């Protein structure tokens, strides 16, 4: 493992007991602050334009130096319980800046206030919105981290169920795909994960 990776893991491990003890409200606030910081880091490189849906909000994050056509539909992480539009914009700003392509990020509705299938419904509405904007499925890339990584797979299954054309590709960043917590990896990596515990998941 490279030195910088070891440093990151050690820092995350330090915060692990604190994160596990945070309330939902505190976790949400912390994630929002992280998003604001990420957006600030890229403020000279991107333009941000909010977009309102009936039940949720989204935003366009556009690189000033656009190098590619198409769009990334980014679904944020947060265990389906955390992640506001500010957090989504932060991660989207990083994607837009690094990839040189437009990113659309919905702040899908969260549990426990809005249980399943609210998040999936909002993800589907966001995909349909991009189609209405004139993007072809072959021009749309789905990306998501953690819970958002799992949600992009759920969205593709829903599109397949509806007989809709699938996007050109998927980028799952540490996707959460086992909501039952019954996989061997939960037990085998219990002490290895630098920031999460099975109980927190």
Where are these regions (language model features)?
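A glycine/proline-hinged amphipathic helix-loop "lid/cap" segment
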Residues: 1-66
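Alpha/beta-hydrolase superfamily serine-hydrolase fold, recognizing
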Residues: 47-201
């Amino acid at each position: 493992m490279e030195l910088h990776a070891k440093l990151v893991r050690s820092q995350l491990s330090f915060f692990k007991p604190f994160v596990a003890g945070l309330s939902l409200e505190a976790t949400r606030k912390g994630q929002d602050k992280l998003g604001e910081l990420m957006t600030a880091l890229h403020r000279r490189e991107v333009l941000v334009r909010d977009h309102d849906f009936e039940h949720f909000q989204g935003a366009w994050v556009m690189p000033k130096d656009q190098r590619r056509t198409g769009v990334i539909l980014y679904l944020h992480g947060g265990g389906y319980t955390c992640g506001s539009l500010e957090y989504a914009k932060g991660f989207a700003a990083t994607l837009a800046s690094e990839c040189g392509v437009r990113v659309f990020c919905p702040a899908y509705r969260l549990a426990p206030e809005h249980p399943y299938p609210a998040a999936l419904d909002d993800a589907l509405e966001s995909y349909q919105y991009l189609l209405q904007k004139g993007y072809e499925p072959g021009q749309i890339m789905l990306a998501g981290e953690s819970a958002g990584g799992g949600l992009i797979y759920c969205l593709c299954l829903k599109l397949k169920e509806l007989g809709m054309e699938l996007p050109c590709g998927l980028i799952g960043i540490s996707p959460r795909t086992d909501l039952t917590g019954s996989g061997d990896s939960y037990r085998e990596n219990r002490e290895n994960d630098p920031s999460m515990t099975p109980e927190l998941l």
